[in-house]
Amino acid sequence: ANQRLPPLSNDPDRCERAFVGNT
């Protein structure tokens, strides 16, 4: 599930939020 999300290396919280918001 880490294919279209931002680099969780910078903000793991933003990665999950972007994924839920993008999907």
Swiss-Prot record:
Keywords: Chloroplast, Plastid, Thylakoid. It comes from the Eukaryota. This is Thylakoid lumenal 17.4 kDa protein. It is found in: Plastid, Chloroplast thylakoid lumen. The keyword Thylakoid applies. Its main location: plastid. Residues 1-23 are annotated as: Disordered. The keyword Thylakoid applies. One of its GO terms (cellular component) is chloroplast thylakoid lumen.
